[in-house]
Amino acid sequence: MADVVPAEEFLELAGGRVHLLRGGTGEPVLFLHAAGGAGGWLPFHGLLASAGFEVIAPDHPGFGKSDEFPDAEGVDDLVFHYLDVLDALGLDRPHVVGASFGGWIAAELAVCAPHRIGSLTLLSAAGLRLPGHPVADLFLMPPAKVAATLFHNPPPASSSAARAPGTPPDLDAIIAAYREATSLARFCWVPFMSDPKLERRLRRVTAPTLVVAPSDDQVIPVEHARRYAARIPGAAYAEVPDCGHAMHVEKPAEFASSVTEFLSAHPLAAGESGVSR
């Protein structure tokens, strides 16, 4: 069952407010969203919460309802931002799950502060530089092309997306999308969607790690996930057929099942979970 209703909260940090959704009870799971996944409680979140975990889903700086945090200029700054978030939540060593851009942040966090990560799950994580397998440039794509690129079977356009002739566009949605695209560019435009030093530092990851890759990832080629799995000591690897980049959206039940099985096999040590309530 995926009927957990999340609570909406705001954390007050030195640089501004962080918006988050939290639901479920049990060992804490910090979920770091993809570039387009701020502010939503997805079916995957509900499934994981219903499986006996407390899911905590914050919005990155400049995304969703979180403040800008203008001093955060790169992914390295986001690492320290999320260490502040962990401290504010009273979390010592939570499970950390990251999707795409959020997976990159999660990997850097596990490299920089391995003692703060109970387990690590990476889904279609960005962050590596593989010249033979470049990351798609979503900034240059029209919205329809983005949807076709993110999914193996793109969902039909919602009724809200189809406007009658003469109907004004949703300016709030346009402004929010522009803000988030600007924030993403601030963090990862140069070098583009990668940290050239990350690959050689992945040996520092000590947490149990699961790397999940959709076989039909047209945004971040599957070779990136395979490289993550090869470089992180002891990492488990799972490749899901007939699925696109946004696997946690396209196949939430399958992804939740893989994550639940992995987290259940790697429970947090007694006294280290930092359960926040």
Language-model segment annotations:
Residues 243-256:
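Catalytic histidine-centered segment of alpha/beta-hydrolase-like enzymes
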Residues 205, 211-213, 217:
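Short beta-strand/loop motif that positions the catalytic acidic residue
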Residues 1-29, 50-53, 92, 260-277:
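Alpha/beta-hydrolase fold catalytic core
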Residues 16-65:
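Conserved HGGG/HGGXW glycine-rich cap/lid loop of the alpha/beta-hydrolase fold
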Residues 218-224:
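Conserved alpha/beta-hydrolase "acid-adjacent" motif
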Residues 107-112, 118-149:
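Flexible "cap/lid" loop of the alpha/beta hydrolase fold
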Residues 171-200:
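Hydrophobic, aromatic-rich cap/lid helix
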Residues 56-97, 257:
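Active-site loop/oxyanion-hole signature of alpha/beta-hydrolase fold enzymes
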